[in-house]
A protein has these predicted regions:
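Loop/turn segments within WD40 beta-propeller blades
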Residues: 22-30, 84-93, 141-146
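Alpha-solenoid helical-repeat scaffolds
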Residues: 105-107, 113-147
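WD40/WD-repeat beta-propeller blade N-cap
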Residues: 5, 12-19, 58-64, 73-79, ...
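A structural motif specific to WD40 beta-propellers
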Residues: 7-10, 52-54, 117
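Leucine-rich repeat domain C-terminal region
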Residues: 37-66, 72, 83-85
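Structural hallmark of WD40 beta-propellers
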Residues: 8, 28-33, 41-42, 92-98, ...
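Structured, charged interaction cores in eukaryotic nuclear gene-expression proteins
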Residues: 79-113
Length: 147
């Protein structure tokens, strides 16, 4: 550089806190999706570091989070403790669904756009007796049936 400063050649990133769940994404197994205690969902490529990407941090209100800045994130959701993914039709709809610690709702994520989806899944039977389900972690299973 003309001013004597160095240029950034490569930059690696990962979870800021410990990962909670790690699993392969896709049929060929080239990508690994992981969730961490930092409420982030990340994708790591086995093929090349340049294909690694962050799918973002789980937030109750993304718009307010952007306005206030990430360091003052009062809308951050609890850590993702379980998730399921399937790449079938992932260009048409969200392909990942996540369960958060201590919450009865599940959030959707778009792998292609690398963002948290607009959909949340909340079962009505859990809202009728919250004390009964407050310490239960739901299991997520996505089944795609060919038409």
């Amino acid at each position: 550089m003309p001013d004597g400063s160095a240029r950034l050649l490569r930059q690696r990133h990962g979870h800021h806190l410990s990962p909670v769940k790690i699993r392969f994404h896709g049929q060929n197994g080239e990508n690994i999706v992981s969730s961490g205690l930092d409420s982030c969902l990340m994708s790591f490529s086995i093929d090349h570091d340049s294909k690694n990407k962050s799918l973002g941090r789980a937030s109750f209100n993304k718009i307010e989070t952007r306005k206030s800045g990430l360091k003052l994130d009062e809308h951050k959701m609890p850590p993702i403790v379980d998730f399921a993914s399937d790449e079938t039709k992932q260009s048409d709809w969200d392909s990942i669904i996540c369960v958060h610690q201590g919450l009865r709702l599940a959030t959707s994520w778009d792998y292609i756009k690398s963002t948290m989806g607009k959909h949340t899944v909340d079962n009505e039977r859990f809202s009728q007796n919250e004390n009964k389900y407050s310490n239960v972690v739901a299991t997520v299973n996505i089944e795609v049936v060919p038409a």
